[in-house]
From Swiss-Prot:
CDD domains: GH85_ENGase (cd06547)
Any single GO CC term annotated in Swiss-Prot or TrEMBL for this entry: cytosol
Organism field: Mus musculus
Similarity remark: Belongs to the glycosyl hydrolase 85 family.
Upper lineage: Eukaryota, Metazoa, Chordata, Craniata, Vertebrata
GO molecular function: mannosyl-glycoprotein endo-beta-N-acetylglucosaminidase activity
Localization terms from the record: Cytoplasm, Cytosol
EC number: 3.2.1.96
Protein name: Cytosolic endo-beta-N-acetylglucosaminidase
Keyword Hydrolase attached: yes
Gene: Engase
Annotated segments matching region Disordered: 1-45
Length: 734
């Protein structure tokens, strides 16, 4: 680990803010406000960074754009002016807002001619609890989890440059959904802004386009909705198609799969005049970018006229649907299916504006029921897409809960909301057996119990006497599978039951697909049920040691290893079968806590280690003051940075150990104690906020050890010895 020269507190924004401890030790009395770093090798020959800090209650201010002013928690942000946009350049703090999740491979690709579904998220001005990058403690937050039904997610607000909060990009990308920000100008001020960059020469609008592309590329979202809702001068409107063409071309170069969409507002004369359709007055903008988002007051005759206008680009016309049903619109609210029926009849894509109506206008206590009702009414008009890459791992966590659970063990109690932590969600709804059978299975979110995170998947169903089993398809996949695949399912039944649960999968390319270790369930040979492993293979024991065992919280894990050659994995199903010999009607309630599908060879590859953990941007606040007027307890806030190959990580769990009263800088960590969980990070940095610690006495060091636990994409626990570590030693001024 390289170290730099001693830095002042004002330079703490740099990534490596300290000097070797032995060089700085003699400078402590002369420079009591400075921080020092050293290295030591512990008994296990692991390198550990040590930082020294003299407590001060006058920290340097943090840049307001990036941090909540009251707590210093990192926040997502927007830009309000053209000057802010052109001046933007990435700082260290911008790293908090960079998406960890790449856009996963999906089928069909977004570029296919199939009509698409766009969700435009407009909720109460935007940047609500979702702005807190590391999550927040809020009850009954809004959540979206029907990702398999949508293709594009637009984050909308009335700020000039709406950069999507990173939590939405992480959640959407995990489901193969691309994310767009919004560039909007409105009213007289918007007209002046447009005049400033569109009415001039080519470099003026190219500079704006370049900056929009750089922002999308840096924060790892996928493009922009351009919404000019003010009149344009002749010079400005003349340059607008050129601006769109340049922006689209540059975005396609820098952001693979990137999109630029134009909202139906200004016409080619420069007049602000919504058309509710694509026509000759606005076609020039459609021809200059990737798609056209219509206004909402259309009728079927608008759709009929647009068929000829769009030609081969029907899917690039996104017909707007205001879910709030404001003004003179078709459908909306729980009648939104009427809008979609007409849109799909004519082959267009759909743009659902503000489907958060179910949260904003209906009872919060009934949110999940209303959310499921809303999307179930639209289901027949919403083609799904398939994920086509491994590893495929999900605990069904919604990114929220009333407590946190880590592999069956309760970690913290209290409400939390962290959308970046939302894991891949299944196909929700009611699934009935074909024909006259009365068998069914319903899938729901379950916040009352969890294996990992804050929720699980609840499956309720009925096996009628005339059939032996019922099954529900949870995931649509399109994965060319490797020769050997490891699968795992964690589940529990509610109450006593003899019903059996099994994981099933379907494969494509049946003629060339050779399967080992599975039962064939249908005549075509495409549906299979893996045989559970009683004992995991020795080479996988580190990851699958609990197979077949009862786990914490009453959960059970089943593991499978299957041999495949020339196969395409298409669907994951869960089936429920009646007890042998029984012909009674059987009902069941089952919770799924996790499903894993992993290339077995990837489990044998060595994982990278968390390295170079640093501590900077320290802030102290007195919490409790003793009889002598000195603080006895403190609140510590600081920023951790580390190095790790992010492509290998699902996230990082941050922990700490606290100790006071040691006069030795090499005091051992309380290895026998369980570290305190602080939070989740979806970047190579984390802001610790208001951590309560005991103040150190005169001549003593307080000690906090921070631990960074990597969570690999395969979803297994990493031994604590392989976590990253950094120690903060703090003392009172002499």
């Amino acid at each position: 680990m390289e170290t730099s020269s001693v830095l002042t507190r004002g330079a703490a924004r740099q990534r490596s803010p300290a000097a070797p401890e032995k060089q700085a030790r003699d400078q402590t009395e002369r420079r009591p406000g400075r921080r020092r770093q050293g290295r030591r090798i512990n008994e296990d020959q692991e390198e550990e960074a040590v930082f020294r800090e003299v407590v001060s209650f006058t920290p340097d201010p943090l840049p307001a754009r990036y941090y909540d002013k009251d707590t210093t928690r990192p926040i997502s942000f927007y830009l309000s002016t053209l000057e802010e946009l052109l001046a933007w350049t990435p700082l260290m703090e911008d790293g908090f807002n960079v998406a960890l999740e790449p856009l996963v491979c999906r089928r069909p690709p977004l570029s296919s001619p199939r009509p698409r579904t766009l969700l435009c998220h407009d909720m109460m001005g935007g940047y609500l609890e979702d702005r807190f990058i590391q999550g927040s403690e809020v009850q009954n937050p809004y959540s979206f989890y029907h990702w398999q039904y949508i293709d594009i997610f637009v984050y909308f607000s009335h700020h000039t440059v709406t950069i999507p909060p990173v939590c939405w990009t992480n959640a959407a990308h995990r489901h193969g959904v691309c994310v767009l920000g919004t560039f909007i100008t409105e009213w007289q001020e918007g007209g002046r802004l447009c005049e400033a960059f569109l009415a001039g020469d080519e470099p003026s609008f190219q500079a704006v386009a370049d900056r929009l592309v750089q922002i999308a590329q840096f924060f790892r979202f996928d493009g922009w909705l351009i919404n000019i809702e003010n009149s344009l001068t002749p010079a400005a409107v003349r340059n607008t198609p050129l601006f769109l063409q340049y922006l689209t071309a540059q975005l396609h170069q820098q952001v693979p799969g990137g999109l630029v969409l134009w909202y139906d507002s200004v016409v080619q004369s420069g007049q602000l005049k919504w058309q509710d359709e694509l026509n000759d007055q606005n076609r020039v903008f459609f021809d200059s970018c990737d798609g056209f988002f219509t206004n909402y007051n259309w009728r079927e005759d608008h759709l009929q006229r647009m068929v000829a206008q769009a030609g081969e680009r029907l899917a690039d016309v996104y017909v707007g649907v205001d879910v709030f049903a404001r003004s003179n619109v078709v459908g909306g609210r729980f009648d939104t299916d009427k809008s979609l029926e007409l849109i799909r009849k004519h082959g267009f894509s759909a743009a659902l504006f503000a489907p958060g109506w179910v949260y904003e206008c209906l009872e919060k206590s009934d949110f999940f029921q209303n959310q499921d009702k809303f999307w179930s009414l639209l289901e027949r008009f919403l083609p799904t897409h398939s994920i086509c890459s491994l590893p495929f791992v999900t605990s069904f966590c919604l990114g929220l809960g009333t407590r946190r659970v880590c592999y069956g063990k309760e970690q913290a109690v209290g409400p939390w909301y962290h959308p970046s932590a939302q894991e891949t969600q299944p196909l929700f709804g009611e699934h009935k057996l074909a024909g006259d059978s009365r068998g069914w299975v319903k899938t729901h979110c379950c916040l009352t119990d969890a294996w990992h995170g804050g929720s699980s998947l609840l499956l309720r169903g009925l096996i009628p006497p005339e059939v032996d089993s019922v099954a529900v398809r949870l995931f649509s996949l399109h994965i060319p599978v490797p020769p050997k695949v490891f699968l795992s399912m964690v589940y529990k039944f509610e109450g006593s039951t003899d019903v059996q649960v099994a994981l099933e999968l379907t494969t494509g390319d049946a003629s060339s697909c050779h399967v080992g270790g599975m039962l064939v369930l249908n005549e075509t040979g495409s549906r299979h049920s893996p045989r559970p492993l009683r004992v995991p293979p020795t080479r996988l024991a580190r990851w699958a040691s609990s197979c077949g065992q009862q786990l914490s919280g009453g959960w059970i894990q089943r593991c499978y290893e299957v041999n495949l050659r020339g196969c395409l994995l298409q669907d994951l199903l869960v089936s429920f079968s009646r007890p042998p010999g029984s012909r009674e009607e059987e009902s069941f309630i089952c919770r799924l806590g996790e499903i894993q599908v992993v290339d077995a060879s990837s489990l044998l590859a060595p994982l990278p280690r968390v390295q170079n953990v640093t501590i900077s941007q320290i802030r102290w606040l007195p919490l409790i003051t003793g009889s002598e007027g000195l603080p006895t307890r403190l609140l510590l806030s600081c920023t951790l940075h580390w190095s790790y190959l992010l492509l290998r990580a699902r996230c990082f769990r941050i922990h700490c150990w606290k100790r006071t009263g040691s006069s030795s800088s090499v005091a051992e960590s309380p290895e026998t104690e369980k570290p305190t969980f602080l939070g989740l990070a979806f970047a190579n940095q984390y802001r610790v906020v208001d951590l309560a610690v005991e103040a150190a006495g005169f001549g003593q060091d307080g000690r906090v050890e921070f631990l960074v636990e990597p969570v690999p994409r395969e979803g297994f626990l990493v031994p604590q010895a392989e976590w990253g570590k950094a120690v903060l030693l703090f003392s009172v001024p002499q």
